[in-house]
Amino acid sequence: MSSDQEMAIFGEAAPYLRKSEKERIEAQNKPFDAKTSVFVAEPKESFVKGTVQSREGGKVTVKTEAGATLTVKEDQVFPMNPPKFDKIEDMAMMTHLHEPAVLYNLKERYAAWMIYTYSGLFCVTVNPYKWLPVYNAEVVTAYRGKKRQEAPPHIFSISDNAYQFMLTDRENQSILITGESGAGKTVNTKRVIQYFATIAVTGEKKKEEPTSGKMQGTLEDQIISANPLLEAFGNAKTVRNDNSSRFGKFIRIHFGTTGKLASADIETYLLEKSRVTFQLKAERSYHIFYQIMSNKKPELIEMLLITTNPYDYAFVSQGEITVPSIDDQEELMATDSAIEILGFTSDERVSIYKLTGAVMHYGNLKFKQKQREEQAEPDGTEVADKAAYLQGLNSADLLKALCYPRVKVGNEFVTKGQTVQQVYNAVGALAKAVYDKMFLWMVTRINQQLDTKQPRQYFIGVLDIAGFEIFDFNSLEQLCINFTNEKLQQFFNHHMFVLEQEEYKKEGIEWEFIDFGMDLAACIELIEKPMGIFSILEEECMFPKATDTSFKNKLYEQHLGKSNNFQKPKPAKGKVEAHFSLIHYAGTVDYNITGWLDKNKDPLNETVVGLYQKSSVKTLAFLFTGAAGADAEAGGGKKGGKKKGSSFQTVSALFRENLNKLMTNLRSTHPHFVRCIIPNETKTPGAMEHELVLHQLRCNGVLEGIRICRKGFPSRILYADFKQRYKVLNASAIPEGQFIDSKKASEKLLGSIDIDHTQYKFGHTKVFFKAGLLGLLEEMRDEKLAQLITRTQARCRGFLARVEYQKMVERRESIFCIQYNIRAFMNVKHWPWMKLYFKIKPLLKSAETEKEMANMKEEFEKTKESLAKAEAKRKELEEKMVALMQEKNDLQLQVQAEADSLADAEERCDQLIKTKIQLEAKIKEVTERAEDEEEINAELTAKKRKLEDECSELKKDIDDLELTLAKVEKEKHATENKVKNLTEEMAGLDETIAKLTKEKKALQEAHQQTLDDLQAEEDKVNTLTKAKTKLEQQVDDLEGSLEQEKKLRMDLERAKRKLEGDLKLAQESTMDIENDKQQLDEKLKKKEFEMSNLQSKIEDEQALAMQLQKKIKELQARIEELEEEIEAERASRAKAEKQRSDLSRELEEISERLEEAGGATSAQIEMNKKREAEFQKMRRDLEEATLQHEATAATLRKKHADSVAELGEQIDNLQRVKQKLEKEKSEMKMEIDDLASNMETVSKAKGNLEKMCRTLEDQLSELKTKEEEQQRLINDLTAQRARLQTESGEYSRQLDEKDTLVSQLSRGKQAFTQQIEELKRQLEEEIKAKSALAHAVQSSRHDCDLLREQYEEEQEAKAELQRAMSKANSEVAQWRTKYETDAIQRTEELEEAKKKLAQRLQDAEEHVEAVNAKCASLEKTKQRLQNEVEDLMIDVERSNAACAALDKKQRNFDKILAEWKQKYEETHAELEASQKESRSLSTELFKVKNAYEESLDQLETLKRENKNLQQEISDLTEQIAEGGKRIHELEKIKKQVEQEKSEIQAALEEAEASLEHEEGKILRIQLELNQVKSEVDRKIAEKDEEIDQLKRNHVRVVESMQSMLDAEIRSRNDAIRLKKKMEGDLNEMEIQLNHANRMAAEALRNYRNTQGILKDTQIHLDDALRSQEDLKEQLAMVERRANLLQAEIEELRATLEQTERSRKVAEQELLDASERVQLLHTQNTSLINTKKKLETDISQIQGEMEDIIQEARNAEEKAKKAITDAAMMAEELKKEQDTSAHLERMKKNLEQTVKDLQHRLDEAEQLALKGGKKQIQKLEARVRELEGEVESEQKRNVETVKGLRKHERRVKELTYQTEEDRKNILRLQDLVDKLQAKVKSYKRQAEEAEEQSNVNLSKFRKLQHELEEAEERADIAESQVNKLRVKSREVHTKIISEE
């Protein structure tokens, strides 16, 4: 196992490949009982872990880890491996090899995301269903050149081993990858190809061929690009896999003599043709069909004559049509790119798409049966025409060939009739044949392209084929797949055990050869041998009358009862009938033979095949070339005319031929096996289903391999290693002191151990063990080591104790000796003789001094002579030393020169390394940039789709709003007509009725014109939407640009603002039209109401205005009060903040004092901890209370601002209405007089037309002045119209120029797309070049290491010389110090003992001082806590003041409710006035009824018009009750109050719940709170009373509002009843109106003519104004676009210049942009959610649209104010949240500080003062009392916070309702402008990117050249260094010899 340092080369992939050292050590040390730890069989989980409880009578009782107890048989219990085998990398090395051990090892590794595991020769991989970082370039580099045992299991390891074996053994290799669908075979195949394309890269492009469009990339690119193309045509969605390969493939990658890629080819097997015409519900057909219909390339849709809806084509829509994990548009581009890279010509590319489209059309061919015949005939020719056109055929010939095919009978051809079903079968067979042959042809073309004609020597084959399949319904396809796996398993068994047994033979082990490959022979022979299943199937296909039944009977006759592998299936309920069963190695499979004969023959319509051969599509003709006579393959089949008269090759024969070729290829290679496992059916990462995995392990041969392995000796070890490791088991078996061979030692050792001696064998170099024995030896070794270590520890401890005891004895003897001598001296010190001795002894020495002097003189003379000799010798040595120093200096100069040269070489090498690192960074940057661009491109594509969806939804919203507006206008117009008609009927003005009818028609025309204008606006939006879609499609290919993504958010904001501006312009134009219409309406409103009604309304409105002004004043006063309260709250918050800082400072002082004291008692620690927590909690409560108060104040302030704004708007509306009514009053007076005279004239001369004309002339004279004004206006408008037409032409010309510019940009975009493709290819080349450069740098680094080693050797030689020079000096110093230290050693020991005693005394004194300091510190703490209690009392008083302020706010809220109640009463009075007016109108209607009783005979003629008037009267009644609006507003307010009431109720309930929780806390700590409990209970009771009082107040308010609402409902019901009564009266009145209308018709003819002229003039004026506005809008739009384009051009130019100056800044921006992309994605998701919410709100608001339309502008202003207030509130809220978060962090820090101080307080537990403890307890009790008060205040503050949050949500909803719809429409319009600007930006960026790429390429080539030069210089330096090294060694040798 590798160390963590060795695993570091794998980077971030290391944890996913191998366990860390820590985990391995933990596993080895884990407790484990080998006798009781087992796996046990269990029905649900297959196997579970457990512990053996007992064994008796062949039964075992096991307790599982889940706690269940199972009693099972002995053979259902499997021993568990020791913990050191947990997550083992090679399962063949496990002690106990069985199914549960394999299963749990895979499961535990999978849980740790180690998905690769070895199992002997296998590599097992489990699909992780998530991305793991184990395939990057770092991992590829780490595995390169590593042996299998040196690196963790990985597909790269398998690949590298195959590659290395190929190079070293000169043998072809193969990698067999098998597994079920969805297990990851295709992905692992891609990784193998990726590995070879990386390590064996050529880096050279193939030579260009003359055919255009070929050779778009290197060989590596083409090998990699072959995969997307094959996946498009051969992969499909299945139930278990979204990208399942429906064919097998064998990819051969050929290498040259140097190991570089030379070429490649692909062989395919068993393409699932049936999927072309049939799919299950949860599956779909091949990807290519849906890619084409994704509309990513619209030219394909046009070329193939198809639609984009898959459901239009039967062959591809039988299952699902979309796959969430696959982007068909992007996949189409990848497929198309792969076709180009692989060198297909343009004609071949078109042919591929055409044939694919023809297959789709084939599924839509319809046929019917002729009458009275079974003959089929075409049912329409349209589809046949399309299919024939795509295939280059004549449609008539095609249909004729299908319905009347020609068959050969003898030597003649006859025409045969076909039934409808036969024709459909033929069509399906043709479609499958065309698709199959086209797929095989593409594979052939790919192989031709990958064949580079370069010299190639060996290949590595990768086999990706489906694994063993056992389904409920198994057909011929499953038999072929299972037979293939049977052959592969036989091949594996043979290969695996042949290798094993060859090793046994080589090692000389006695072994009886077993051919495990023959284990499967019976099943294989049953299928493929003569008279086998395939043989009988082909024989049956020869007979024309053969059926499935005859085939089954032959099978039974031939094999049932004769072959053990062939059985009759057992009938199973609920499953499809099976006809026979085969026993495969992986299990028994039931096969159903229905349709096998047809599948095997695969017949084709010969006549249609003949047409295909003559097709004008060359590819189709080539596909069927060589198909002669009856079948497309008659001439080419190998068995034609030879096997039982067969003239065709069957599917089974072709399959066996391909399989034999495959097995031949595999037998010629050295195989490597990879088994892919699917862990679960739900694609859940990390989950493993036991039964599913075991089934696959059986099917793919893993357990079969284990079975074979167990029969042999899977564990083996070298003799020397075995002796070294297991010698401890019996050391006496190997004699000491004499040589013994390792083999003999191993034999003796094993013979002396109590084990089964049949479980191992001795080879020549290794000892071989059966499975499990090595684990037993390991356990025995562990036990022996434990015993030895225990014994060693005991002996070591004994020896150390004895040494210490000896030292103690020696010290005691020395002390006794010293004491004895000192006592003896003290005894004789005063003895007289001793004193005399002390005096005489110095005198005795003087006599001897003269002798000593004489001797010294002699010695001096001798010394003098010796000194002279020494001086002479010294001078001689000095001369020698000078010479040596000279030589030394010379050598040092040489060494210095060498060092300098070496330093230069190292410096150059470092520069090269730095250059290489920079290049790698640049290459990595470009690679990451490309990957980011691809990801961004995908994200932007998704965003584009979302924007398109939003656009369509917004368009629908616009339509709905326009319809609503039209409806409102129509209803308004109808209401006005009703009022007009009622007035005329009451006055009896028949002439006026006809006149108003004419005006009504004119207004309808105007209304229609308005609708036309709205339609024109809608068309504009549609045009812009189409332009946006087109531009987005053009920009998709360039969306990878990083700079555009950086600005995307800003562009979207600009787009939104621009669209808002455009929509506002459109709304203003609409409003202008409405104003024009309203001007006409004002003429009609002159006759709408009587004078008395107008007077009463004016008076009512004036009274209401006075009331509203009064309310405004009151609200303003209220706002001032609230502002004062807010200021007070802020002041209290500032005080609380100050107190918090004081408490923090005090806490720091506490910490310092506690550090000085060194600790306190455990009780004090606990109290201090609680006290600090309480302080923090009180601080937090105060801050939360402040936050809540301010939030409440902000909410109230916003509410009052909204109320003031609303009331102000109502006053403005009322004043406008008042002015309007006064104007109407004066005009109506004049017109009433005129109408009165007209009425008299009409009543006197009903039949006299001349009198009526004169009356009209009188009326016209009164209108003469108005007509003259209109005429003058018409003249002005005519001139203006001409001028506008001129401007319109100019604007149209400018618009055309802009369109031309857009088309030019589109063409430029296509060119840039091609340039980007080229840049991508260049990027890939740079990546490959980077790999080569990395190899070169690696070799340079190696050379540098050699130079560094040489330099170190020179340094060592130099140091050796220095050591030799200093050695003599050191020896002299050692001798000198030795005698000095011996003399003073004993004195130092005494001094040391004295110092120790002094030190102990000093320590004791310091301890006493520390205790005194602790006492003083505790006294200080006591004083400080008293001060804190006083501060907290002040805080409580402030909190009480805040509560009082809240109570004041509550009283103000009650006052507001009372004001609203008064407003409701006033509204009720207005309603009663309206009812009074209704009653007066009813009386007048009765009068009209009596006056027109004679008109009953004309009822029928006016019935339809009267019905319309009936509806209009009902609307009029609703409009008369204008108080209804205010009632509706009061209802809204009531609902709000109810909601607030419910919120307050919820808050109160929460407060009660919190109170109960706090009471529970009080009960738990009641022992500590006895002193303050009564006070807390009293305060809680007071707060409860306040809450109850607040509840009662709100209940009373709600009850009063409910009663008012009931009264309002009753009044509305009365109004409805009155309305119904009026409708009945109106029906009677309508009968009377008919007669008067007919009489007045003639009189109004001239008036109509005049009115018509006026209306035409008005229409022309409106048209001119609209044209002018449209042109102005277009001009403004074009100018804005131009300005935006110019501004972005300048901005991008500056940005790119800055990028050139600083590349590092660009890299940082890359990271920032990636983060912003994620942010934009998050914001986009948020906007989508908001949009959905708004759609729901819009549907709720539509019912109130009438009121909203009339007050739209006022509502917009109100919304702006609301947004401003909401923003302010959000800022304040965020500010307070930040403050709260900061305080929370401080709290946590302080709590941590207290915890740290707690440990220091433990030491002083016994020294704490009892008095101090009592005082602290009292203070803590007081603190808790204050805490209770603060918490009670907190409860009320929580209620306020909840109210604030709900109001914030309401503000946001109102803001979105008024703003978001308009913003969404404007955003889309501006997006179009942004995309147009981006086209130019992309163009410039592409050009600059190309230039930058060229610069980088030139730099790279320059650096590569420099690198080569550096390598040459390094070689020269190396040779020089070698020379210097030799020379230096010679000098060194010379110096040593001279010394």
UniProtKB/Swiss-Prot annotation:
Keywords on record: Actin-binding, ATP-binding, Calmodulin-binding, Coiled coil, Cytoplasm, Hearing, Methylation, Motor protein, Muscle protein, Myosin, Nucleotide-binding, Phosphoprotein, Thick filament
SUPFAM superfamilies from the UniProt entry: Myosin rod fragments (SSF90257), P-loop containing nucleoside triphosphate hydrolases (SSF52540), Tropomyosin (SSF57997)
InterPro entries: IQ_motif_EF-hand-BS, Kinesin_motor_dom_sf, Myosin_head_motor_dom-like, Myosin_N, Myosin_S1_N, Myosin_tail, P-loop_NTPase, XRCC4-like_C
Biased composition (Basic and acidic residues): 1128-1147
Cell compartment(s), UniProt: Cytoplasm, Myofibril
Residues recorded with modification Pros-methylhistidine: 757
GO biological process: muscle contraction
Chain residues that bind ATP: 179-186
Principal location listed in the UniProt entry: cytoplasm
Modified residues (Phosphoserine): 1092, 1096, 1162, 1237, 1243, 1261, 1288, 1292, 1303, 1306, 1474, 1495, 1514, 1542, 1554, 1574, 1600, 1603, 1714, 1726, 1739
Note on domains (UniProt): The rodlike tail sequence is highly repetitive, showing cycles of a 28-residue repeat pattern composed of 4 heptapeptides, characteristic for alpha-helical coiled coils. Limited proteolysis of myosin heavy chain produces 1 light meromyosin (LMM) and 1 heavy meromyosin (HMM). HMM can be further cleaved into 2 globular subfragments (S1) and 1 rod-shaped subfragment (S2).
Name the record gives this protein: Myosin-1
Protein source organism: Sus scrofa
Gene name of this polypeptide: MYH1
